[in-house]
Regions:
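The conserved 3'-phosphoadenosine-5'-phosphosulfate
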Residues: 151-153
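Well-ordered mid-protein domain cores that form the structural environment of catalytic cofactors
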Residues: 1-6
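Conserved polymerase palm-domain catalytic core
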Residues: 9-115, 119-142, 148-149, 158, ...
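Right-hand nucleic-acid polymerase module
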Residues: 73, 102, 129, 157-276
Length: 276
């Protein structure tokens, strides 16, 4: 993801107008029969075909009515789409959009795509509108849609003086150039995500216990650090995440176990992974 965002900001230094969109319900709308056909045509090793087709046909487990209701509420339909979260999901998305990517390449558009998020760098507002028409027509051939252009929706046009958002990062004007950094909204999302670990209810709902708590929390933090290593304020992000880790751990042990953190010795703090 960081490579895609870095490519986008590099291209914006050449073409300052930005067209950004998000394919509507992409993974849920993938036509499985079309995907199976693409797998058979594009994957050379036939021995892999059945395995890949089986993976693409997987459904979300519904062990009880409550889980089934949640799945239905998300709009996930059986026998349609590819389930997000699988290691192969990005591979399937690239296979399914292969013809679209070729059309973009043939049209010589300066596009960066990451799964269902895409951004095209342009030289003018009119070019952005032309790109919008092109993308709609090309994606329609795959049975896919994108939202209409608006100032606050998922399809937007950004002028050279505006910060363009892509993959949770901002392509921010910085003098005559552009820099890549976290948007205020994404910083807040990260903060809320980490602070969820201080709620016992959240932990129980997500099968996090005393034995895997530290590993789960560190995994989420490591994911953010890996994804946003290209940010201009990466050092500040590291400090913020360290502070949130400490806050979560202190809050959890204080509120859940009534531990007086201030009375703990340095070894006790270290055992609970709390900075002294």
């Amino acid at each position: 993801m960081s490579d895609a965002a870095a490519s986008a900001v590099a291209l914006r230094n050449l073409k300052p107008w930005v067209y950004k969109t998000d394919i509507t319900k992409f993974f849920d709308e993938i036509n499985r029969e079309t995907l199976k056909d693409v797998i058979r045509r594009k994957v050379r090793h036939r021995s892999l075909h059945n395995m890949l087709i089986d993976a693409a046909s997987r459904e979300i487990s519904e062990p009880n009515k409550s889980r089934a209701a949640k799945v239905k509420k998300l709009g996930v339909m059986k026998n349609c789409g590819v389930r997000q979260g699988m290691p192969l999901s990005p591979f399937f998305s690239n296979l399914f959009l292969h013809e679209f990517d070729r059309a973009v390449e043939n049209a010589r558009l300066s596009m960066v795509r990451y799964a269902d998020d895409l951004i095209v760098l342009c030289s003018s507002h009119d070019e952005c509108l032309d790109v919008d028409s092109f993308c709609r027509n090309a994606l329609d051939k795959r049975g896919l849609k994108i939202p209409p252009i608006s100032e606050t929706g998922k399809t937007q046009v950004y002028a050279p003086s505006q910060t363009a958002e892509f993959l949770g990062l901002g392509l921010i004007p910085d003098g005559k150039k552009y820099k890549l950094d976290l948007t205020t909204e994404q910083k807040e999302k990260i903060r809320r995500r980490i602070l969820q670990f201080s709620s016992v209810t959240y932990l129980a709902d997500n099968r996090v216990n005393i034995f895997n708590f530290g590993r789960k929390l560190d995994g989420v933090i490591a994911g953010y650090l890996g994804s946003y290593s290209c940010c201009a304020s990466f050092n500040d992000l590291e400090k913020t995440l360290d502070g949130l880790r400490s806050k979560v751990t202190r809050t959890l042990f204080k509120d859940t176990f009534n531990i007086d953190i201030s009375a703990l010795s340095p070894p006790g703090l270290a055992f609970l992974c709390i900075p002294d």
